[in-house]
Amino acid sequence: MTGQLVQYGRHRQRRSYARISEVLELPNLIEIQTSSYQWFLDEGLREMFQDISPIEDFTGNLSLEFIDYSLGEPKYPVEESKERDVTYSAPLRVKVRLINKETGEVKDQDVFMGDFPIMTDTGTFIINGAERVIVSQLVRSPSVYFSGKVDKNGKKGFTATVIPNRGAWLEYETDAKDVVYVRIDRTRKLPVTVLLRALGFGSDQEIIDLIGENEYLRNTLDKDNTENTDKALLEIYERLRPGEPPTVENAKSLLDSRFFDPKRYDLASVGRYKINKKLHIKNRLFNQRLAETLVDPETGEILAEKGAILDRRTLDKVLPYLENGIGFKKLYPNGGVVEDEVTLQSIKIYAPTDQEGEQTINVIGNAYIEEGVKNITPSDIIASISYFFNLLHGVGDTDDIDHLGNRRLRSVGELLQNQFRIGLSRMERVVRERMSIQDTNTITPQQLINIRPVIASIKEFFGSSQLSQFMDQTNPLAELTHKRRLSALGPGGLTRERAGMEVRDVHYSHYGRMCPIETPEGPNIGLINSLSSFAKVNRFGFIETPYRRVDPETGKVTPRIDYLTADEEDNYVVAQANARLNDDGSFVDDSIVARFRGENTVVPKDRVDYMDVSPKQVVSAATACIPFLENDDSNRALMGANMQRQAVPLMQPESPIVGTGMEYVSAKDSGAAVICRHPGIVERVEAKNIWVRRYEEVDGQKVKGNLDKYSLLKFVRSNQGTCYNQRPIVSVGDEVEKGEILADGPSMEKGELALGRNVMVGFMTWDGYNYEDAIIMSERLVKDDVYTSIHIEEYESEARDTKLGPEEITRDIPNVGEDALRNLDERGIIRVGAEVKDGDLLVGKVTPKGVTELTAEERLLHAIFGEKAREVRDTSLRVPHGGGGIILDVKVFNREDGDELPPGVNQLVRVYIVQKRKISEGDKMAGRHGNKGVISKILPEEDMPYLPDGTPIDIMLNPLGVPSRMNIGQVLELHLGMAARRLGLHVASPVFDGAREEDVWETLEEAGMSRDAKTVLYDGRTGEPFDNRVSVGIMYMIKLAHMVDDKLHARSTGPYSLVTQQPLGGKAQFGGQRFGEMEVWALEAYGAAYTLQEILTVKSDDVVGRVKTYEAIVKGDNVPEPGVPESFKVLIKELQSLGMDVKILSSDEEEIEMRDLEDDEDAKQNEGLSLPNDEESEELVSADAERDVVTKE
């Protein structure tokens, strides 16, 4: 027997074929959301208040300080917030101190700063009753970037950019004449020496002494027309503020505020870290030849001779001294922007590009600026200019912008913080204004602070930001993946149109950080990614991945695990997870396959620094659920990973027989299961609640403590209309641990993810019904509810105040018979449990109609009965097409009962209709290997091919779907599944470490099957065996959320667009089918003139003609001649608006007069035609036309 048994949770054992032992548990998969939000509450908010505190008025007399803050308790719990359509939030209170410096008076006050949305335990937010997820954003890290460029003549040059978190950009570039230019904040370019002069290095000689003599600097100085600091400052001022009269003082303050004011320029801690790392002197000294002797300033000891090569060992020896002051220079710029001294570190080396090797260049570092300095400093600017000149001489490296060392994540906490900062800075402006207006003696903090801008910016972020998304809740895996999604789009990120191939491509630094498989197909490919399974995010927002440390002395793999960012990993040689180890942790083989900076190489074992922790650290959670991933083509694996997220939760879920061992972890962390919070013993289990008696530790003894109640969700509608239902899987008396699963959620079985069902599949054709990936299925799957799913749809009706009076929800509806009202209660609302079909009443509602001129008869009635017969219109809520089912629940909200309703709404009724959908022809199904298809035929069980023992198979797939698509994983899954079913096992075949081909054959033999796993099949119709043996086995098949019931649509008459009078398009608008240009050609080709005329006129936009035709059909008369299509009139109007005089002539040259729609109405009245055109259908048209416009945008 191959493999070993592994326990997953309490209820499931699997035979695992893994050979590599797991040294690291998977982290909590939604930690990226929860820990980031926790950081925001603990530190992010405090940072924000510290940034703007204190706020002083323009005279400096009043000062407002933010001292402390606290979050209260949420108003409603999570479930109630969803029901009531409110935001799940807690009040934020801030302790504020107002100090009057004249009188010395101090006022403290607690100020309410609005309700702040709170993250639920599962990493989501409830905003206005809808569950939303904030997606993490991948952006360029603030830093300094150098890149090479080639101009049109083939001359090589360089560009460099200093990118802050917020503030002005600095860009350096070379031109064809070897002059170095600088751009400040995207303005016109200046010679770079102008900037140096403005910093206080006024003369040519000072600049040459600073940067070092070289031809590029000479060319630049020749181009530079300014001779001293003042002229340079004026030159820069003219570029930044063209048209304003320049003065030296203004120029100084402008430059100072642009770059050296922490309020205007912010690198953030990550930017400071990256710049210090990039501009550090040691990176450029590596392997260079010294042009000066390095001496220890304290002892006078010679550390490195002039002319020595600084290899790794020499550099390591010199490094401690470099940190402590070798080459440190204090410069005192005069008259520049900055008056303080500038500390630099400068060392001379020989230029590697120089042939004679005599030319020296200065390497300048920025001399270790503390992490707290968030703005750029003159030494940063000088060091970055020096780096640029060094690059021209072949010293230093250019950067790869797509490397994950240069891209970082903004998670929930930081995105919220940035939004909160915008709100606070708006508030700060208001506070300053109020300080100067109001009486300083009587003023209180409460009167100064206007919290509106803060609340507005937070609301805007959660409600309409691109990164705040309606949670994909089709199944638990979709939830989990959505929370772990990384997007390069959004504010401050890329746009789909601008993003090129390079950004979207898989990069070697993605290894273990971002999944190379899971990304959408289509315009977002490569811009939206998924976090790898073991990845974490560090405090700077860079993605780290864990590696096992190899001890450099002994060469053994140690238990120590280091998390490395992408640029840290570039310094090490990393072995694969499948490198063979001895029991003591040493490598078996002398040469090891390893990675170094994206190159796969074979290295001697003593050169290995780290080793992968697990084979699945490359891929995301969803991709890790695909068994035999290593045997699939990556394009198909991508489809497989994406389609698992579209699986509809079934009525009877079943976890896969062939799994990967990832099912348990994914289900547990997704938030769909009920997880035990404390160890204890189960006391009572009901359908809706589970009670667990806690175990407390007292003096090392286990003692029974409090009773915890866990509530289960029963038949709740998910965001996507699937059924969200939890079922207990523990029994009374079970002892449970913390973190154990107490109840399965949707698409779960025994604590494991269960997206589909294990069915018996044969690869064979059958009368051509499975042509082009179609699927043939046995009727057994319909009869036994194998693929039956439950769907819940929500409909709502609101009674509003109108100009003519309030709408009313009532049972008394004009022109509706008692039969249609039989399921409504006395309020006019449908009863729970009633079965409804398309068009049935759900909520009876009437709206007052406008007062019209009364006819003589009505006046007579009015005179007799006194009160006018009630003028109301029926605006009841009815079941839309394809929406029939059983009423699951009805919720009524009244303004009188204190429910929060939108303005103008008095009453709101929500009706939930549940449908049980069996699988049918036209539904889409898929396996886990990207093998998708549509059901083309459901055969009676007796017609399906059957095995020698008489068992009919369930599904027939086309064998031609395998070879060209190269997803062989499905065939291996099929064989292993059959063997496992026969042995009564569940198996786990982890990705990249699963069952090999030999393991599959051994398991087949163990199950007593033939080695090729094929079998004779008999035709169910004739009983004859098929000519060839067929591959039959167990495959895990999933029903996807593209069901034919949602797509089927038919229309006879319906709404028309206002302008063209043509039917609207699309199922949502109850639209027609577009008969387009090409379809017209087809009818023209057949010469079907009358059919064509009908389609273009009475079936589309001949307004009068279609009414007459309708009437003729009803009365049984002949259909009249078509008139003029409305769109033709629109075309004429358009030509007339361009100033053309358009006339329509008949065949005998007589002008035909085109009447407008209004004229047609009069004509109709005279002809006595009744158009179905009361206010209601008109209203429908305009509303739908508006929606039409919205969808088109």
Curated annotation (Swiss-Prot):
Keywords: DNA-directed RNA polymerase, Nucleotidyltransferase, Transcription, Transferase. GO terms for biological process: DNA-templated transcription. Residues 1184-1193 have a biased composition (Basic and acidic residues). The keyword RNA-binding does not apply. One of its GO terms (molecular function) is ribonucleoside binding. It comes from the Bacteria. Residues 1153-1162 have a biased composition (Acidic residues). Residues 1153-1193 are annotated as: Disordered. Gene3D superfamilies: 2.40.50.100, 2.40.50.150, 3.90.1100.10, DNA-directed RNA polymerase, beta subunit, external 1 domain, DNA-directed RNA polymerase, subunit 2, domain 6, RNA polymerase alpha subunit dimerisation domain, RNA polymerase Rpb2, domain 2. The keyword NAD does not apply. Signal peptide: none annotated. Belongs to the RNA polymerase beta chain family. NCBIfam families: PRK00405.1, rpoB. DNA-dependent RNA polymerase catalyzes the transcription of DNA into RNA using the four ribonucleoside triphosphates as substrates. The RNAP catalytic core consists of 2 alpha, 1 beta, 1 beta' and 1 omega subunit. When a sigma factor is associated with the core the holoenzyme is formed, which can initiate transcription. HAMAP family: RNApol_bact_RpoB. This is DNA-directed RNA polymerase subunit beta. It comes from Bacillus licheniformis (strain ATCC 14580 / DSM 13 / JCM 2505 / CCUG 7422 / NBRC 12200 / NCIMB 9375 / NCTC 10341 / NRRL NRS-1264 / Gibson 46).
